[in-house]
Regions:
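Pyridoxal 5′-phosphate
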Residues: 1-120
Length: 120
């Protein structure tokens, strides 16, 4: 099969699948808990964040503006919601205008509609 729609879904590398399966089999602890499985899960998540930050910003994992946080989301819609609602609320004192177009992804448009109902 030849799959050409990598905008929506991209097949991951086999090594990524193997690592994920290992984590699901052995790293299922709640990372917010204090028992050993939870502590191990927290350590795994911190290591993953560090690897992603280093891939994005180099060996220090820091950008030009200093340290960065990395938030894992369940997917694009959740990430869009977090970014758009967060930016709108953070910057609302500078103005409540949001510019978008009808060709945006539905997740973006729904955020903008919700913000419009809140006076943006």
């Amino acid at each position: 099969m030849i799959y050409l729609d990598n905008s929506a879904t991209t097949k991951q590398y086999d090594e990524v699948t193997e690592i994920m399966v290992e984590a699901m089999k052995n790293g299922f602890g709640n990372p917010s808990s204090l028992y050993q499985l939870g502590l191990d899960a927290e350590k795994t998540i911190k290591a993953a964040r560090s690897r992603v930050l280093k891939a994005a910003f180099g060996e220090t994992g820091k950008g030009g503006a200093g340290d960065y946080d990395l938030v894992f989301t369940s997917g694009g819609t959740e990430a869009d919601n977090m970014a758009i609602f967060g930016a709108a609320k953070l910057l609302q004192r500078q103005g409540r205008q949001i510019v978008t177009t009808a060709v945006e992804h539905p997740a973006v448009l729904e955020c903008c509609r919700a913000l419009e109902e809140q006076g943006f």
